[in-house]
Amino acid sequence: MACWWPLLLELWTVMPTWAGDELLNICMNAKHHKRVPSPEDKLYEECIPWKDNACCTLTTSWEAHLDVSPLYNFSLFHCGLLMPGCRKHFIQAICFYECSPNLGPWIQPVGSLGWEVAPSGQGERVVNVPLCQEDCEEWWEDCRMSYTCKSNWRGGWDWSQGKNRCPKGAQCLPFSHYFPTPADLCEKTWSNSFKASPERRNSGRCLQKWFEPAQGNPNVAVARLFASSAPSWELSYTIMVCSLFLPFLS
């Protein structure tokens, strides 16, 4: 029996590393994502930061920039044109969602979150991705004078004409009415896909929805940090059971 204990101790040591690696450099199972990330030399505009390693294709990056995106037949202009800076933030957020291979620690099956049918062929989504404080603040500041009619854009639209329209009785009002704070905008727009982090950029503890390509992807290290704190409970349980039965094998 004694010869087994060093092996078990070694497994306990490497287990968090194994679990963490499973959450790194992956694409979610969703309608437009590639199966695995890979270089995409010709990504479009706001999606360019992910060209070295992307979960999106050139086509997806192009469609993310259209006023009525074919990705989900969703129009950002349901209450008229957005201010240019506001529109840019939303396109960056779409590129981040579609292209980033660094969202593994926050990926969850859609069915586990209360939806009986996965929307738009989507099997997975992200939940509570911690966006840096500046990302939420700048997004809110640049959008607060644009107009919308809902705080949760993930559902509840009128799709009778093939694209999203404001539901009956919903008023088009400034973003600041539906999103009183930067955290409200980050967290409510897509039903808690993002979370407003109190951490700032370069802290190593929050993700940036956009970054300068020449400076490298700061989200790689952040994803590794969060992945290392999310061990695989399935593997942990297996090792625990084995350790309990070892005395009977002597």
Curated annotation (Swiss-Prot):
Question: Which segments are removed on maturation as propeptide?
Answer: 229-250
The record lists the effect of W62A as: Nearly abolishes interaction with IZUMO1
Which domain of life, per UniProt?
Eukaryota
**Resulting phenotype, E45A:** Nearly abolishes interaction with IZUMO1
Return the GO cellular component terms, semicolon-separated. Answer: external side of plasma membrane; extracellular region; microvillus membrane; plasma membrane
Kindly give the membrane topology term recorded for this protein. Lipid-anchor; GPI-anchor
What are the protein's UniProt keywords?
Answer: Cell membrane, Cell projection, Disulfide bond, Fertilization, Glycoprotein, GPI-anchor, Lipoprotein, Membrane, Receptor, Signal
> How is the quaternary structure described?
Monomer. Interacts with IZUMO1; the interaction is direct. IZUMO1 and IZUMO1R/JUNO form a complex with 1:1 stoichiometry. Interacts with FCRL3/MAIA; FCRL3/MAIA replaces IZUMO1R/JUNO as IZUMO1 receptor after sperm-egg adhesion, thereby permitting species-specific gamete fusion. Interacts with WDR54.
Q: Where in the cell is it found?
A: Cell membrane; Cell projection, Microvillus membrane
PANTHER family for this protein: FOLATE RECEPTOR, SPERM-EGG FUSION PROTEIN JUNO
Q: What is this protein called?
A: Sperm-egg fusion protein Juno
According to the Swiss-Prot or TrEMBL entry, at which residues is a lipid covalently attached (GPI-anchor amidated serine)? S228
InterPro entries on file: Folate_rcpt, Folate_rcpt-like
Residue positions the entry lists as glycosylated: N73
Describe its PTM?
The protein is rapidly cleaved following fertilization, being only weakly detectable in zona-intact fertilized eggs at telophase II and undetectable at the pronuclear stage. Sheding is probably required to block to polyspermy and ensuring egg fusion with a single sperm.
Instruction: List GO BP terms, alphabetically.
Output: cell adhesion; fusion of sperm to egg plasma membrane involved in single fertilization; single fertilization; sperm-egg recognition
In what tissue types does this protein appear? Expressed in unfertilized oocytes (at protein level).
A Pfam family it matches: Folate_rec
The task this protein performs is described as: Receptor for IZUMO1 present at the cell surface of oocytes (oolemma), which is essential for species-specific gamete recognition and fertilization. The IZUMO1:IZUMO1R/JUNO interaction is a necessary adhesion event between sperm and egg that is required for fertilization but is not sufficient for cell fusion. The ligand-receptor interaction probably does not act as a membrane 'fusogen'. Does not bind folate.
